[in-house]
UniProtKB/Swiss-Prot annotation:
SUPFAM superfamilies, alphabetized: Ribosome-binding factor A, RbfA (SSF89919)
Organism in which the protein naturally occurs: Acinetobacter baumannii (strain ACICU)
Subcellular locations according to the entry: Cytoplasm
One GO process term, biological-process aspect: maturation of SSU-rRNA
Protein name: Ribosome-binding factor A
Role of this protein: One of several proteins that assist in the late maturation steps of the functional core of the 30S ribosomal subunit. Associates with free 30S ribosomal subunits (but not with 30S subunits that are part of 70S ribosomes or polysomes). Required for efficient processing of 16S rRNA. May interact with the 5'-terminal helix region of 16S rRNA.
Ranges in coiled-coil conformation: none
InterPro entries: KH_dom-like_a/b, RbfA, RbfA_dom_sf
Species lineage: Bacteria, Pseudomonadati, Pseudomonadota, Gammaproteobacteria, Moraxellales
One CC-aspect GO term: cytosol
Gene: rbfA
Family: Belongs to the RbfA family.
Any one GO molecular function term: ribosomal small subunit binding
Pfam families the record matches: RBFA
Protein's UniProt keywords contain Cytoplasm: yes
Length: 133
């Protein structure tokens, strides 16, 4: 079993090295846009690493965006064996975790919340003028 600090160090190493590997070694033309690793969570036994990714640089509709994210996750999950092998060469540990890629929805949720706040701020003067009458 690994301690909390060790898990954090391992997650940070995996995130740093995977970011570099995806940028430099993964040459799939279907990976349009910038794939960013927003976080990594390593299981206590170091058997798995859940990798959370976002895709930036694509201006698409919501439906197209969802399809693009799914396609990106499929590409990354299919390349996970290669990425794990390369990762094991870069980080010198006895166990290299299996990689599971997930889409990180925090950016999308943040944009959604920002839109709601912006709409509320725009409606505020309208409501104040209605209250005065």
């Amino acid at each position: 079993m690994a301690g909390g600090q060790r898990l954090k160090r391992m997650a940070d190493s995996v995130q740093r090295e995977l970011s570099e590997l995806i940028r430099q070694e993964l040459k799939d033309p279907r990976l349009g846009g910038l794939v960013t690793i927003s976080g990594v969570k390593v299981s206590p036994d170091l058997g798995y690493a859940d990798v959370y990714v976002t895709v930036m640089g694509r201006e698409l509709s919501d439906d197209q965006n969802e399809v693009a994210h799914r396609e990106t996750l499929d590409i990354l999950n299919k390349a996970s064996g290669f990425l794990r092998q390369e990762l094991s060469r870069r980080i010198k540990t006895r166990i290299t975790p299996r990689l599971r890629f997930h889409y990180d929805k925090t950016n999308a949720y943040g944009n959604y919340m920002f839109g709601l706040i912006e709409k509320a701020v725009q409606d505020l003067p309208k409501r104040e003028s209605d209250d005065k009458e």
